[in-house]
């Protein structure tokens, strides 16, 4: 695992790279809750439900990607990340008056983002982390549909999932992802949840999350009955919004609550496209490859994941 960079030019985003003192974050302005992933496992829904709680203020936009920093030439990674923007930029997205301040960036759990856990431990060492997981094959298919819809995947599902180092299999290695964070954070500050619990046992699951972050666990809102989907076609919508300068519309208008939900719903409407067929031999091949990951997650959580092996 790489160590977190502490040079002022990284932390402050200085163009000239001149040495200076690392800025002190504003008291209470940094997050103490981070939903780290996994992608296509329900992080948008969880982010929305958390933001409904009166003691919790989640970031807008949802995915700040602050701890991600990658050069454009990195194999398997698109250019992006906001590590270069500095702590003050990051802190500006959180309400200092909120008891719990959080964000949700599924890119944090990507195993290729080796610097993320140590960077987080250096900036928000007391943060509590939440990771959502789902059946790895279902997650791969959902991720594949998302990338196809955004115009970034031209190969069929079998070719894409057999491609060495592909994002679909890589981001389904949950045990590897969890262990990376446990190298920088104690076990009691990582909560791992199944998407099916959020889907079918939402009240109990949200009460558990609320207890984990230290707020009133009896809170419930009728708006939690909704499932907040990420759209398979959201990539194109987001790109269009950025070209039009509308990507931070919710934040600029100061929208919250019901208005915020409806505006985000309009630009996140799910695609009607059907899931691609998974060849049986490919499914067996992938599950065999992921067996150590499934077993590792069982050891970490105490779950019985027999249903994931078929």
Placement of each model-derived feature along the sequence:
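PAPS-dependent sulfotransferase catalytic core
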Residues: 1-108, 123, 127, 137, ...
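The conserved 3'-phosphoadenosine-5'-phosphosulfate
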Residues: 2, 62, 179-284, 288, ...
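Generic structural signal for small/hydrophobic residues in well-ordered secondary structure
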Residues: 42-43, 90, 102, 120, ...
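Short catalytic/ligand-binding loop motif for oxyanion handling, primarily in non-cytosolic enzymes
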Residues: 44-45, 66-67, 109-113, 137-142, ...
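Surface-exposed cleft-lining segments at the edges of enzyme active sites
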Residues: 74-76, 103-108, 158-169, 196, ...
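Acidic-and-aromatic substrate-binding clefts and catalytic sites of carbohydrate-active enzymes
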Residues: 79-84, 108-114, 169, 197-201
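Alpha-helical packing segments of well-folded alpha/beta enzyme cores
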Residues: 86, 90-93, 116, 174-178, ...
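PAPS-dependent sulfotransferase catalytic domain
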Residues: 118-119, 126-132, 138-204, 208
């Amino acid at each position: 695992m790489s160590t977190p960079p502490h040079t002022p030019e990284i932390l402050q985003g200085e163009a000239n790279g001149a040495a200076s003192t690392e800025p002190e974050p504003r008291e209470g302005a940094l997050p103490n809750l981070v939903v780290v992933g996994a992608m296509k496992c329900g992080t948008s829904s969880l982010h929305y439900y958390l933001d409904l709680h009166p003691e919790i203020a989640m970031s807008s936009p949802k995915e700040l990607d602050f701890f991600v920093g990658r050069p454009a030439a990195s194999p398997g990674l698109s250019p992006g990340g906001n590590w270069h923007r500095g702590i003050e930029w990051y802190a500006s997205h959180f309400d200092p008056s909120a008891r719990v301040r959080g964000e949700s960036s599924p890119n944090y759990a990507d195993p290729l983002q080796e610097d993320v856990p140590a960077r987080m431990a250096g900036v928000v060492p007391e943060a509590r982390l939440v990771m959502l997981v789902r059946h790895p094959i279902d997650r791969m298919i959902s991720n594949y549909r998302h990338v196809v819809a955004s115009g970034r995947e031209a190969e069929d599902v079998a070719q894409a999932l057999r491609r060495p180092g592909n994002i679909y299999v890589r981001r389904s290695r949950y045990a590897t992802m969890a262990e990376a964070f446990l190298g920088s954070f104690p076990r009691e500050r990582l909560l791992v949840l199944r998407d099916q619990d959020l889907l079918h046992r939402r009240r109990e699951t949200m009460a558990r999350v609320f207890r984990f972050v230290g707020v009133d666990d009896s809170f419930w809102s009728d708006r939690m009955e909704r499932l907040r989907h990420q759209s398979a076609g959201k990539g194109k919508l987001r790109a269009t919004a950025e070209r039009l300068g509308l990507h931070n519309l919710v934040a600029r208008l100061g929208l919250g609550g019901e208005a915020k939900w409806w505006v985000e719903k309009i630009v996140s409407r799910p695609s009607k496209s059907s899931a691609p067929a998974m060849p049986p031999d490919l499914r067996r091949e992938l599950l065999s490859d992921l067996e150590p990951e499934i077993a590792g997650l069982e050891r970490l959580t105490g779950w019985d994941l027999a249903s994931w092996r078929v």
